[in-house]
Swiss-Prot record:
Protein name: tRNA dimethylallyltransferase
Region (Interaction with substrate tRNA): 36-39
Record EC number: 2.5.1.75
Region forming the signal peptide: none
Length: 299
């Protein structure tokens, strides 16, 4: 089976993945697929660091604004949506470029989790429904029975982990249809932290408070409201924190999230990282993509 070549850009938040994705899309006739679990939601633009209107006009973006904030979204949903987008992009002779930071989503797509083949989709849905009916105590008992330990336990993580364990044999044998070039962006920790702090400041200047307050007043308990960028501001709205304290909390949580992202990509995916402050960046990335696609550099 001839596999479909795709480019995947990963790295910590605020590292510049969107800008690189647009650059590659222009250079290699590509279209971008968002691999971010929060950017699927309509009306949540600033806190999710969604590509701006100008950026979306510079390159076609997929899987942005495809869910209402009241709806849930999972790795299963992402794989189904991403598969359709990849097929659509390739059918028009273009290069799929996945830009994202949600490690589980990307791993699920690239390693065949929830793809067709040996995995019985109806069985997956039935098992997920069974788990969702359990209370927290019974759900975590299932984790212990299966010798599963996960960090920062919550229901969604627990259900994902149990699904993977339940269908491990089928998933192990499920072959992905893609040949990915995984490009990792990173730099010194202080460089990344400074970029995160600057981004949070820009978000607040650009209207994050209004966006977060709308979410808090209308849908404070939905899945979308638990994303970094919103929940940190909720205490400010009820007078439990000053704006400066809430802003600092958001910066700290985002830095911690960036660290977790890097740990995930290093441990779970075969990533070769490029420093964004290197003198030959992004030319070195363009060269890697050109070699991957078997293209010659234009003279």
């Amino acid at each position: 089976m001839t596999k479909i070549k795709i480019v995947v850009i990963v790295g910590p938040t605020a590292v510049g993945k969107t800008a690189l994705g647009i650059s590659l899309a222009k250079a290699f006739n590509g279209e971008i697929i968002s691999g971010d679990s929060q950017q699927v939601y309509r009306q949540l633009d600033i806190g999710t660091a969604k590509a701006t209107q100008e950026e979306q006009e510079a390159a076609v973006h997929h899987l942005i604004d495809i869910r209402e904030v009241t709806e849930s979204y999972s790795a299963y949903d992402f794989v189904q949506d991403a598969q359709k987008s990849i097929s659509d992009i390739v059918s028009r002779g273009k290069l799929p470029i996945i830009v994202g930071g949600t490690g589980l989503y990307l791993q699920s797509l690239l390693e065949g989790y929830h793809l067709g083949g040996q995995v019985d989709q109806e069985a997956v849905k039935a098992y997920r429904n069974e788990l969702e009916q359990l209370d927290d105590h019974d759900l975590y008992e299932r984790l212990q029975v299966n010798n599963i330990t996960i960090e920062q336990v919550n229901r969604r993580r627990a259900i994902r982990a149990l699904e993977l364990a339940q269908f491990a044999d089928e998933l192990e044998n499920a072959e992905t249809a893609y040949e990915p070039l995984i490009i990792g962006l990173n730099d010194d920790r202080q460089v990344i932290y400074d970029r995160i702090n600057q981004r949070v400041n820009r978000m607040i200047e650009n209207g994050l408070l209004e966006e977060a307050k709308w979410l808090y007043e209308h849908y404070p308990t939905v899945q979308a409201s638990r994303g970094i960028g919103y929940k940190e501001l909720f205490p400010y709205f009820v007078g439990e924190m000053t704006l400066a304290e809430a802003s600092d909390q958001l910066k700290q949580n985002t830095r911690r999230f960036a660290k977790r992202q890097l740990t995930w990509f290093r441990n779970r995916m075969a990533v070769s990282f490029t420093a964004i402050t290197a003198p030959d960046y992004p030319q070195v990335v363009h060269d890697r993509v050109r070699d991957f696609l078997g293209q010659k550099e234009k003279s």
